[in-house]
Structure formats: C-alpha cells, structure tokens
C-alpha cells in the first residue's frame, strides 16, 4: 500500500502526517513552525528531519505540501512571501524536499488545498 508524507505549513504551526492516500492516517502531529524565530532554514531542517523519520518508519511513495504564501505549483517555489513566514520568497520547496527524500513532491498554496 502507498504511503505519503504530507505537510500543512502555516505561520505558527506545521501539521505533519503519513497517510495511505485513502483517508487513513498512520501518524500525525502538530509542530511549532520555527521560521518566525529561527528563520526559514530552521523550518526546512524540521521538514527534512520529519521526512527522514517517516521514511524510516514507512515506505513512502511521495510527498504533498500545502503551504501559506503564493506558490508556483509547477516548480514548487514560493513566489511571494507569506505574511507570517519571513523571507519565504524564493524557497524552492519542491526541489529541496525531493532531493532530501528522493521522492516526487507536490507543493500548492494551502487555500487551494482546502
């Protein structure tokens, strides 16, 4: 059965989960987003750390990300800063996470995912 790591990135919290894509959550958690106090790099490090943990526990098939900010969905790059995530613009989220996990990644604005 397929497993997907999914993230909902907001200004204050990041919701993380592993799902089978059919509505069953194998694991889920809510973490404080460190971007406001420690910078975007700390947020990226947290995402990569969770991906590695999830990948150890479950055979992952892909990664899905819903995030605050304007997203170029084709490239998975943050096209415009999110008001609550400083210096987010230009972050190549899709590339970073794909390279870290070796998996396909989809990134979209969180409102479009609701």
Range-by-range predicted roles:
Residues 63-69:
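Glycine-rich beta-strand-to-loop/alpha-helix junction loops that act as flexible
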Residues 2-45, 58, 78-79:
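Short glycine-rich, Thr/Ser-proximal phosphate-binding strand/loop in the N-terminal lobe
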Residues 44-63, 101-105:
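Phosphate/pyrophosphate-binding loops at sites that engage ATP/ADP/AMP, CoA/4′-phosphopantetheine
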Residues 34, 41, 45, 71-114:
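Glycine-rich phosphate-binding loop and adjoining helix at the ATP-binding site
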């Amino acid at each position: 059965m397929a497993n997907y790591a999914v993230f909902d990135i907001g200004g204050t919290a990041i919701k993380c989960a592993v799902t089978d894509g059919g509505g069953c959550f194998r694991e889920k958690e809510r973490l404080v987003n460190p971007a406001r106090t420690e910078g975007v790099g700390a947020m990226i490090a947290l995402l990569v750390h969770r991906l590695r943990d999830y990948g150890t526990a479950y055979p992952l098939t892909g990664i899905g990300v819903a995030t605050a900010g304007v997203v170029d969905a084709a490239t998975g790059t943050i096209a415009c800063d999110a008001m609550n995530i400083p210096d987010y613009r230009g972050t190549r989220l899709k590339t970073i996470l794909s390279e870290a996990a070796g998996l396909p990644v989809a990134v979209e604005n969180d409102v479009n995912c609701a």
